[in-house]
Amino acid sequence: MAIVSSSSGRKPPRRPEALMDPQQAPEEVVSRPEDKLRPQRLDDYIGQSELKQVLGIAVQAALGRGDALDHVLLYGPPGLGKTTMAMVLAEEMGVHCKVTSAPALERPRDIVGLLVNLQPRDLLFIDEIHRLSRVAEELLYPAMEDRRLDLTVGKGSTARTRSLDLPPFTLVGATTRAGSLSSPLRDRFGLIQRLEFYGQGDLEAIVERTAGLIGVTLTPQARSSIAASCRGTPRIANRLLRRVRDVASVRGGGGGAINQALVGEALSLHRVDHRGLDASDRRLLQLLIDHHGGGPVGLETLAAALGDDPVTLETVVEPFLMQQGLLMRTPRGRMVTDAARSHLAEAA
């Protein structure tokens, strides 16, 4: 499977605690064997069982017809495996996967160049697809629906439209903000699937698999502790495991399985607690309690007080805190829960 990657363009500001930031780019570097952590096939992809069932049937049906897979939109919090799933789909279909991101497609020729170079049944993956420009979207409409590219040649009275036929292809879009997609674009995806946060069992399996790939051994308690502290996110689980490995190599005396004490030391070093909250999470909750009586507080006010970006708070920080029952969104703003107060008191 060939992968062409294009990733230019600005990204939203990141939180200081990059270790626990699911938007932070994964550390896989394909030139280093130990970093080949991505699963290659659906059978190797841990978790997201309903998603795998739906996409597995779609892949088998497309292969049976000898046609391209229908266009796929994957959405959900960052770090849950949307890019990995796109690559897995290409592998299952036996085609090339071209990878780019919406901010990199600033000019019409950027997306035209990708589309005209697609081979039959190839897969084009666009990350952050909600950030596509209007011009790029309009070029995609006929490409997705009619496998046709409409180009305007010339200007003014001499302008004319030229149509180019495209081979059957699959567009896989990924987004953390499905509601920000325009209806015409969203409606052209035949498969729209959400990725959910991972459960403890699946995360332990991911940690165990990654540990084997990078050559470390964990006690069951250590594996469980890492899985419980990674915010339900495989990308963070793999990153935490690397930091635990660092501590073990320096403090562990060499040899033997990594135990829970070493995991605890690594988490403490990076200010991550046993539920996966980092210093920024605790600061947000504490600010709501200390300065606003627990809320409600508007998103913009909260972001300004924290010196953070509202979009990052809404798409990266809040989903996990709400999933953990520590934060509520109300029509009047954000509020902490009794569970958040108890957790902060316990951690104090």
Curated annotation (Swiss-Prot):
Q: Where is this region: Large ATPase domain (RuvB-L)?
A: 13-198
Q: Where does DNA bind?
A: R329, R334
Q: Supply the enzyme class, top level.
A: hydrolase
Q: Where is this region: Disordered?
A: 1-37
Residue segments, region Head domain (RuvB-H): 274-348
Q: Per the UniProt record, which EC number(s) apply here?
A: 3.6.4.-
Q: Which reaction does it catalyse?
A: ATP + H2O = ADP + phosphate + H(+)
List the residue ranges of the region (Small ATPAse domain (RuvB-S)).
Answer: 199-271
* Places the protein is found: Cytoplasm
* Ranges of Low complexity composition bias in the record: 1-10
| Pfam families documented for this protein | AAA_lid_4, RuvB_C, RuvB_N
Q: So which domain of life are we looking at? A: Bacteria
Keywords on record: ATP-binding, Cytoplasm, DNA damage, DNA recombination, DNA repair, DNA-binding, Hydrolase, Nucleotide-binding
Q: Which GO terms describe its molecular function?
A: ATP binding; ATP hydrolysis activity; four-way junction DNA binding; four-way junction helicase activity
One GO BP on record is: DNA recombination
* Subunit structure, interactors included: Homohexamer. Forms an RuvA(8)-RuvB(12)-Holliday junction (HJ) complex. HJ DNA is sandwiched between 2 RuvA tetramers; dsDNA enters through RuvA and exits via RuvB. An RuvB hexamer assembles on each DNA strand where it exits the tetramer. Each RuvB hexamer is contacted by two RuvA subunits (via domain III) on 2 adjacent RuvB subunits; this complex drives branch migration. In the full resolvosome a probable DNA-RuvA(4)-RuvB(12)-RuvC(2) complex forms which resolves the HJ.
Family statement drawn from the similarity comment of this UniProt entry = Belongs to the RuvB family.
Q: What does this protein do?
A: The RuvA-RuvB-RuvC complex processes Holliday junction (HJ) DNA during genetic recombination and DNA repair, while the RuvA-RuvB complex plays an important role in the rescue of blocked DNA replication forks via replication fork reversal (RFR). RuvA specifically binds to HJ cruciform DNA, conferring on it an open structure. The RuvB hexamer acts as an ATP-dependent pump, pulling dsDNA into and through the RuvAB complex. RuvB forms 2 homohexamers on either side of HJ DNA bound by 1 or 2 RuvA tetramers; 4 subunits per hexamer contact DNA at a time.
Instruction: Share the domain note from the entry.
Output: Has 3 domains, the large (RuvB-L) and small ATPase (RuvB-S) domains and the C-terminal head (RuvB-H) domain. The head domain binds DNA, while the ATPase domains jointly bind ATP, ADP or are empty depending on the state of the subunit in the translocation cycle. During a single DNA translocation step the structure of each domain remains the same, but their relative positions change.
PANTHER family linked to this entry? HOLLIDAY JUNCTION BRANCH MIGRATION COMPLEX SUBUNIT RUVB (PTHR42848:SF1), PTHR42848
Protein name in UniProt: Holliday junction branch migration complex subunit RuvB
